[in-house]
A protein has these predicted regions:
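HKD-type phospholipase D/PLD-like phosphodiesterase module
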Residues: 172-206, 211
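Primarily the HKD phosphodiesterase
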Residues: 131-186
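Signature of lipid phosphatidyltransferase scaffolds
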Residues: 93-96, 222-257
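Short beta->alpha connector loops
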Residues: 24, 146-150, 202
Length: 257
């Protein structure tokens, strides 16, 4: 078993080849182009996989064997999970993951390859400018905030004005501050039919947002400290994961309007 694991995971070339063949048979030229690899580097990896009967060759076409199909089917979720943590191990290990429900922890491979974004000091509480077009063209936006974000009311109202279905979940203290100290912004949200919710639970993320083409998640540190950095992903499966997270908190919140 260890030799099989070594064969698959100790070579990026072999692993990437198997991932590509999971989509169907490919000829050698397609493989070289897709993986951006020369034949002299590719053929030794193909031979090793053929020797283990993980892939089979039919003329110039390569495909997964029946055993290979089973192996790759089980391998893909693990590969996706490794993509989630690769490059962001420090963030995931030092932040409080308790706000992520267990059923979504088990499906974290759905997040795919994530980006860790750290805003500069002059724009700590501002919405990322490179996501504005994506946000404003979204038909559905679901957000959660445990802290008061000055950008939040106009952003949510703007999306609603554009015809989006907007759901905004707020910590109870944040909601009260918005309603009492920012009455104008609060009324704008109501006028534009933004669905408002109050979340009173003790365990909560710092914030998250899921729109049509992106999701982002911000967690508190394990000692409760605030961190401006956020995890972002753009894959369809990540959006599905983000919508499940949003629904989890909507189901546990009180709807205001």
């Amino acid at each position: 078993m260890s030799s099989l694991i070594d064969l698959i995971f100790f070579s990026e070339k072999r692993k990437n080849l198997l991932v590509q063949l999971a989509d169907g048979p490919m000829d050698i030229d397609e493989i070289k182009e897709t993986l951006n690899i020369k034949a002299c580097a590719l053929m030794p990896q193909i031979k090793k996989l053929k020797d283990m009967d993980i892939i089979v060759q039919k003329g110039n076409i390569y495909e997964l064997s029946d055993i290979g199909e089973v192996i790759v089917e089980k391998m893909l979720p693990l590969t996706s999970l490794l993509d989630v943590f690769d490059g962001n191990k420090d963030y995931w290990s030092k932040h409080d993951r308790a706000p992520i429900p267990k059923h979504l922890i088990k499906k974290m491979d759905m997040l795919g390859k994530c980006i860790l974004e750290e805003p500069d000091l002059d724009h700590l509480f501002e919405f990322p400018k490179h996501l504005c077009d994506r946000l404003h063209s979204s038909k559905t936006v679901k957000s959660f905030y445990s802290y008061f974000c000055p950008d939040c009311p106009p952003i949510q109202a703007g999306c609603a004005k554009n015809g989006a279905e907007v759901h905004l979940i707020l910590d109870e203290k944040v909601y009260n501050r918005l309603k009492n100290d920012f009455e104008g912004e609060y009324n704008v949200l109501l006028e534009n039919k933004v669905s408002l919710y109050i979340y009173s639970g003790k365990i909560r993320p710092s914030s998250f947002m899921v729109a049509d083409t992106f999701m982002m998640l911000k967690l508190f540190g394990k000692d409760g400290e605030f961190d401006h950095r956020k995890i972002m992903s753009f894959t369809p499966s990540a959006l599905e994961w983000g919508n499940e997270l949003a629904q989890y908190y909507i189901d546990r919140s009180m709807k205001i309007n």
